[in-house]
A protein has these predicted regions:
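Short, glycine/proline-biased beta-turn/loop segments that scaffold the active-site neighborhood
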Residues: 101-125, 216-222
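Conserved catalytic neighborhood of penicillin-recognizing serine enzymes
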Residues: 116-149, 229-245
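Residue-level structural signal for beta-strand termini and adjacent loop
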Residues: 78, 133, 275-276
């Protein structure tokens, strides 16, 4: 059994009707819905926002806080180009979900497993439902699954990275460049900004599958041999702050600690991005930004 999570199901996983196993989700407690969101623009007006006296102190290299209309509530070095680690898997999630066919099986190939940790441990020849793989990568950030989904989508990881750059521009992310699906530092030349990632956060909130996955606190991942692996969401704010509605973590030595997070309270939705934190303060600072945006 997975950790005891209030209000969450702990049913044992069952195989799907077509013989390809599926995980059993540990469902998050019901939370507020997101309102309609507006898409970012290359020419959006984002003059520097002077933090109010009661704004939280952010020690990370860059940060931004926006509302559901893209209005900036706080920013610090929001246009600095920085590595963003696994937070860019939100873009992977959007692209895979938009392609569709999530109920279809896909078979793991040998190159999919050539990934650095964090890894789920999938093996060549194994078959999984795409939705189960995508949910796992958004919850636990598994790099081998990210490679598999990228290859299945575009034929290869480099081709998928090129498609990521196209989709990023469509979302208004004009100051980002991606070279792989996972956020790892190789190949080099990969970067984004806090402002661009805030646009990605809005797009993630608009996508129903991604929105549901990123607020999932934990799930059982089921392998084809029937064994299961309990995994918990890497986003600690999702567990410490009851109004948090999820999003995505990231960490590499080069990027430091990165976090895209969101929260909802009293009909208001806010989105915070922190890049380049060198301490575990990323969690408390993210929560502080969310509370500030919600007027708490």
């Amino acid at each position: 059994m997975l950790i005891g999570t209030t209000g969450c199901s702990t049913k044992e996983p069952q195989a799907s009707s077509d013989g390809v196993p599926s995980p059993v989700l540990i469902r998050p407690e019901p939370g507020p819905r997101y309102p309609s969101l507006v898409q970012g623009s290359r020419h959006s007006n984002h003059a520097a926002t002077a933090p109010a006296e009661n704004a939280p102190k952010i020690t990370a290299k860059a940060a931004i806080l926006i509302d559901s209309h893209g209005r900036v509530l706080y920013e610090k070095n929001a246009d600095a180009r920085l590595p963003c680690a696994s937070t860019q898997k939100l873009l992977l999630g959007i692209m895979i979900a938009e392609r569709g066919g999530l109920s279809q099986p896909m078979t793991i190939q040998e190159p999919d497993t050539w990934a650095e940790p964090t890894k789920m441990g999938i093996k060549p020849g194994q078959a999984y439902i795409k939705a189960d793989l995508l949910r796992a990568v958004l919850v636990r950030s598994s790099n081998d699954i990210a490679r598999a989904l990228a290859r299945d989508h575009s034929g290869s990881v480099p081709a998928f990275a090129a498609n990521m750059n196209v989709r990023a521009r469509q979302l208004g992310m004009y100051n980002s460049h991606f070279t792989n699906a996972s956020g790892l530092p190789t190949p080099p030349g990969q970067y984004s900004t806090a402002r661009d990632l805030s646009k990605l956060a809005l797009a993630s909130a608009r996508n129903g599958f991604v929105r549901d996955a990123i607020r999932t606190k934990g799930l059982y991942f089921r392998f084809p041999d029937g064994t299961t692996k309990p995994i918990t969401n890497t986003n600690q704010v999702l567990r410490s702050f009851p109004y948090c509605t999820g999003m995505k973590t990231g960490y590499t030595n080069a990027a430091g600690r990165c976090l895209v997070s969101s929260a909802s309270y009293g009909g208001k939705n806010v989105y915070a991005v922190i890049l380049g934190s060198k301490t575990p303060n990323v969690w408390s600072e993210s929560e502080a930004l969310l509370r500030y945006g919600l007027g708490m």
